[in-house]
């Protein structure tokens, strides 16, 4: 039986591991930190606009497992917010444990705190990947799903510095591009002004730290939109966002909060 090694345990890594297991392979899933889902732990927005069709297509094609979980732990359904309709919002405080339980129930070999730092190749074939500990993990096929975020040096050089985001590079080490270790040049995104990379489009706030009025609106409606005075509006932040579908004027003219279990403030940063 072939062994597939998946590098990175975010949503895409979990999906790849499940797909490989369903195809009859032995699967090893290597995750750099102590949690699955990566930025999915601060995500939450599903089925909005065209994502609804994409979700239903994936389910119809046999890839229902992860969508069943996000649907099961949905806090708000058929929710509208600026520029987006019929969204479902999953609870980020509950989703990771349940994805972890699913992965383990499928007998996928899940290994946390397993930061991959290098590869061993034979010509154009990858033989193994090397962990920070020096251990080598061998396989017949390797799938890189490490994403494109970090490490800290990039956040310092091209951003506002390390804010200890959910990826927690200071604790677990930064992401290493396995494709670049194989000699493949990574695609590099640029902003309109030519700067490299992009910012996360949102900030997570403790919902209980907000006013009772805002909490009530979030709990009941799933979303709160608070108009900003002219002097606090900053349209330049829109160009910084990774998710350009949220780079609409409404997101600079208002504070847009979404209830994901915590409060998701739809802005890359906000001066207090």
Feature locations, PLM:
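Predominantly flavin-linked oxidoreductase catalytic cores and closely associated redox partners
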Residues: 110-251, 255, 263-272
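N-terminal Rossmann-like FAD-binding beta1-loop-alpha1 element of flavoenzymes
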Residues: 3-28
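Conserved N-terminal/central alpha/beta ligand/cofactor-binding core
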Residues: 19, 25-26, 31-118, 151, ...
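Short amphipathic alpha-helical segments and helix-helix/interface helices
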Residues: 17, 99-100, 215, 272
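Conserved active-site and cofactor/substrate-binding residues in soluble primary-metabolism enzymes
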Residues: 11, 15, 22, 90, ...
